[in-house]
Regions:
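Sequence-structural signature of mature extracellular/luminal beta-sheet repeat domains
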Residues: 1-313
Length: 313
């Protein structure tokens, strides 16, 4: 494994556990602040503007149809706060359920699109990605309590609210999710195992059966990290590399599509939680450093992958 220390630019500070960055064409970055319960916009000069106060625990964000922002809301987290740092320690005391929300970024108006599937409450939706067919995949990491935790799942849903179904269950706290450039492979990472799984798709929203030593419907292991490391949210770049925020280590892990090589870009915060691509030719990586509450950027060695509804032409 190669370890790289990139030259960083700090864009904003004072964020309340930022996650879910979306790099906009105007140079701003829309993100969530989980502890603050908001969807916020960070301008290029570092100013932070609240778009909407969503309640619960807004966790991930993606641009969807019609210029609206789709948010995975985990329902709320309890935080331990110390001078200059914060980190989640479990389910919020006022938690009820998770949901998928739609936000109109110009007005801040929002609505709940989904909060259950086949009679089962969504527990803790975490990350999402849109496909070109009009649907989106999202992970439900579940919730952690003092003595027990939920089992995680992956769902596929239509953006208009007409359909949601469970696609993969169970997983060990699934977090980041993304599609390969040809949209024939779905990538999902698990937080505690620091494993990246690949699932072949036979059609939009349909997982092809795969053989695996561990579990047939779980897909193929692309990479797993050794030692005490975790995987959080991810982005896929233009060459199909899976770029995964890596807490504990405090890095963005660059996984080759075939798993043959793994590099790590070390960042100055042990809670690196998400990454996205923007800027000229999508060569700028934006990362949320959540424990210290900062948004930083650095140059990525390859262009990022253009996203449906955002910058895909």
């Amino acid at each position: 494994m190669n370890t790289i220390a990139p030259a960083l630019k700090q864009i904003a500070s004072g964020l309340r556990f930022p996650e879910g960055p979306v790099a906009m064409d105007d140079g701003s970055v829309i993100l969530v602040e989980i502890e603050r319960q908001t969807l916020s916009r960070v301008t290029p000069d570092g100013k932070v503007q609240v778009i909407a106060t969503l309640g619960g625990g807004p966790n991930g964000a993606a641009m969807g149809p019609g210029g609206k922002i789709y948010v995975t809301n985990n329902g709320g987290l309890k935080f331990m706060v110390r001078p200059g740092k914060m980190f989640p320690i479990g389910q919020a005391d006022d938690y009820t359920r998770g949901s998928i929300q739609i936000v109109e970024p110009l007005t801040g108006k929002f609505e709940t699109l989904y909060d259950a599937c086949d009679g089962q409450r969504l527990r803790g939706p975490n990350d999402l990605v849109f496909d070109r067919a009009g649907g989106f995949w999202f992970t439900d990491l579940g919730k952690t309590r003092d003595r027990d935790m939920d089992r995680g799942a992956v769902y596929y849903a239509k953006a208009d609210g007409s359909m949601i179904r469970e696609a993969i269950f169970p997983l060990e706290r699934p977090n980041g999710i993304g599609l390969s450039p040809d949209e024939r492979t779905l990538y999902v990472v698990e937080t505690p195992t620091a494993r990246c799984w690949a699932f072949r798709l036979s059609a939009p929203g349909q997982i092809e059966s795969a053989k695996s030593v561990f579990r047939g419907d779980r897909g193929t292991l692309v990479a797993g990290l050794g030692g005490y490391q975790m995987f959080d949210s991810l982005a896929v770049d233009g060459e199909g590399h899976v770029c995964v925020a890596t807490p504990i280590t405090g890095a963005v892990t660059d996984v080759w599509p075939d798993g043959s090589r793994v590099d790590q870009y070390k960042l100055p915060d042990m809670m690196v939680t998400n990454v996205c691509f923007g800027g000229r030719a999508l060569r700028t990586a934006f990362a949320t450093l959540s424990m210290g509450g900062t948004l930083v950027s650095f140059e990525w060695p390859r262009p990022g992958l253009a996203l449906n509804h955002l910058n895909k032409k």
